[in-house]
């Protein structure tokens, strides 16, 4: 029993230490993304199609958080791992540490009626030291938060740029269509004026009480005087948008978009139901339990040895 107790103590001190830090994450509250939502409202008001809400931001956060390769890359650049060893040993250590990270959805599909009124995930990391486990979990969460902020803002700016490019091309095309239509209208008015003068129609036909089936291509119902005045007005327009409110509105919106600048707004892509904890109890059986189990095993083996010895003597 004494030998077993000694061996148990040696084993208890030789076993690797394992400490697990945990964090519980949820969809961010409105106030945590208020700056971002204000920018999105401005952009949507100018006709930019932005699909995104707090849930989408949180899902992007979880997606990036769950990436083993991203966690390994962060470990290499974070200074948390001793990079003075050879590359093979370093790679093995990083892979081992990456396997200690777990991301679990707290929703239980077997208990659909007992689900929480919000979505939450539990993130945990197991390290060889208390402070190390908490520090790595904190550092990785901060890194992912930074990556999500960067991607969300880049996506927002990219959507604005695409809308501006599409708006410019659409306006240019519509301007060409309107200019062609105006040129054709002016040419038709010239022909109509010639026809009206040739027919001796100077005043509008309806003012003379006449019912005439007008030519759809070269209308003369206004009379030469009316056609000449209309031709004068159409020819005096320097821009096709002068009498086109739709075109003017689109140009105004485009100018507002071009003047819009999205700053690097700060927002929280995740809400912490539980911040990364400092583990107070190491994983696995404690030294006292190992000692008790070792003594019990030693006692059983000792009793078995004595009984077997007596049986052989008998």
Region roles according to the model:
Residues 75-258:
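Soluble oligomerization/assembly scaffold segments of membrane-associated complexes
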Residues 20-26, 120-126, 269-275:
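Soluble periplasmic/extracytoplasmic beta-strand elements of cell-envelope proteins
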Residues 252-299:
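Interfacial amphipathic helix/helix-coil modules
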Residues 15-115, 183:
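Extracytoplasmic
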Residues 28-30, 130, 300:
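Short coil/turn motifs at secondary-structure junctions
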Residues 1-12:
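Hydrophobic membrane-insertion alpha-helices, especially the h-region
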Residues 1, 17, 283-290, 298-314:
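Juxtamembrane interface at the cytosolic side of transmembrane helices
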């Amino acid at each position: 029993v004494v030998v077993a107790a000694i061996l148990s103590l040696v084993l208890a001190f030789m076993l690797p230490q394992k400490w697990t830090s945990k964090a519980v994450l949820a969809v961010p509250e409105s106030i945590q993304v208020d700056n971002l939502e204000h920018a999105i409202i401005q952009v949507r008001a100018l006709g930019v199609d932005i699909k995104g809400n707090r849930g989408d931001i949180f899902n992007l956060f979880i997606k990036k958080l769950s990436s083993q390769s991203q966690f390994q890359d962060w470990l290499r650049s974070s200074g948390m791992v001793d990079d003075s060893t050879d590359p093979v040993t370093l790679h093995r250590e990083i892979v081992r540490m990456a396997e200690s990270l777990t991301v679990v959805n707290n929703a239980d599909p077997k208990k659909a009626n007992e689900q929480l009124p919000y979505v939450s995930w539990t993130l945990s990391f197991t390290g060889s030291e208390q402070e190390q486990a908490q520090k790595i979990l904190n550092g990785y969460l901060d890194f992912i938060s930074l990556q999500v902020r960067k991607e969300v803002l880049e996506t927002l700016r990219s959507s604005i740029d695409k809308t501006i490019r599409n708006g410019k091309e659409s306006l240019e095309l519509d301007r060409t269509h309107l200019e062609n239509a105006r040129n054709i209208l002016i040419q038709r008015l010239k022909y109509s004026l010639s026809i009206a003068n040739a027919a001796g129609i100077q005043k509008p036909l309806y003012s003379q009480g006449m019912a005439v089936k007008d030519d759809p291509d070269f209308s003369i119902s206004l009379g030469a005087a009316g056609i000449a005045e209309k031709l004068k007005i159409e020819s005096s327009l320097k821009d096709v948008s002068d009498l086109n409110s739709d075109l003017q509105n689109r140009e105004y919106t485009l100018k507002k978009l071009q003047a819009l600048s999205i700053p690097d707004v700060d927002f929280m892509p995740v809400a912490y139901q539980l911040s990364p904890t400092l583990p107070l109890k190491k994983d696995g059986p404690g030294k006292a339990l190992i000692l008790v189990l070792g003594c019990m095993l030693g006692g059983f083996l000792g009793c078995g040895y004595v009984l077997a010895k007596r049986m052989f003597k008998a």
